């Protein structure tokens, strides 16, 4: 594995929102290289564009201008089929809200990406059992979300995001609704999957103590990313 491999690169990314009263430029020129197995935290006050930036990295939103490269290939935003393939094969998303399907069991929620991707049922189950074991969720596989704690529900969301073995995990305030102990458990999972599965992680967080567990910390301020010393 080449840990110097660039997974994604942002070049002069700008994002403007247009309103009847005028326009608001949230991102004013973001430049960032993300390498294989990086652990990156993006911090900053509410409303500065952290989620917008994460969504642009994940191709859930588009920049007003600038270029994004995945695996040294420039993204073409007019090619939705290729963007969808990129998301499915390489990117896992985790949000502050877990978005689990309440009528589904833990096992059914985790296997959903495989079923959507038309995997065989036996392959879906095999993969799900592997992830359940790794995240210590095996005993809860037939539970529905309402029976789980907040931390357990977020662990299921992580398991679902890991199902298709992504290259990159994008996490938007994944511990925002959790107590301190649950937040630590969830953070430990991120660190383990980074180390054991070589998955690159970009996390938006308000929690400075969690941010310090990452290799690189960037402050989003006034539309620009500023790299901070991790001390």
Which residue ranges define each predicted feature?
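Conserved ABC transporter NBD signature motif
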Residues: 66-77
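Helix-to-loop junction immediately C-terminal to a conserved catalytic motif
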Residues: 58
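A short, proline-enriched helix->beta-strand linker immediately N-terminal to the Walker B motif
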Residues: 163-167
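Hydrophobic anchor residue at the start of the ABC signature
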Residues: 158
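Conserved ABC ATPase signature
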Residues: 144-154
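Catalytic Walker B motif of ABC-type/P-loop ATPase nucleotide-binding domains
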Residues: 169-172
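Short coil-to-helix segment of the ABC ATPase nucleotide-binding domain corresponding to the Q-loop/switch region
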Residues: 104-113
């Amino acid at each position: 594995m080449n840990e110097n491999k660039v997974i994604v690169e942002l070049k002069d990314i700008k994002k403007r929102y247009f309103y009847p009263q005028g326009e608001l430029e949230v991102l004013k020129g973001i430049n960032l290289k993300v390498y294989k197995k990086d652990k990156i935290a993006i911090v900053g006050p509410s409303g500065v564009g952290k989620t917008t930036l994460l969504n642009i990295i994940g191709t859930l939103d588009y920049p007003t201008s600038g270029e994004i490269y995945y695996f040294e290939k420039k993204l073409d935003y007019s090619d939705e089929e290729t963007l969808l393939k990129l998301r499915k094969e390489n990117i896992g998303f985790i949000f502050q809200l877990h978005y689990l399907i309440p009528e589904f069991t833990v096992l059914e929620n985790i296997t959903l990406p495989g079923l959507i991707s038309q995997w065989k049922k036996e392959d879906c189950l095999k993969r799900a059992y592997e992830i359940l074991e790794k995240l210590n969720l095996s005993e809860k596989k037939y539970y529905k979300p309402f029976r789980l704690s907040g931390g357990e529900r977020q662990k299921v969301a992580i398991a679902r995001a890991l199902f298709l073995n992504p290259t990159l995990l994008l996490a938007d305030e994944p511990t925002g609704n959790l107590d301190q102990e649950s937040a630590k458990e969830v953070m430990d999972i991120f660190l383990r999957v980074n180390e054991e599965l070589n998955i690159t992680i970009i996390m938006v967080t308000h929690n400075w103590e969690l941010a310090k567990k990452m290799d690189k910390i960037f402050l989003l301020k006034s539309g620009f990313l500023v790299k901070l010393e991790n001390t």
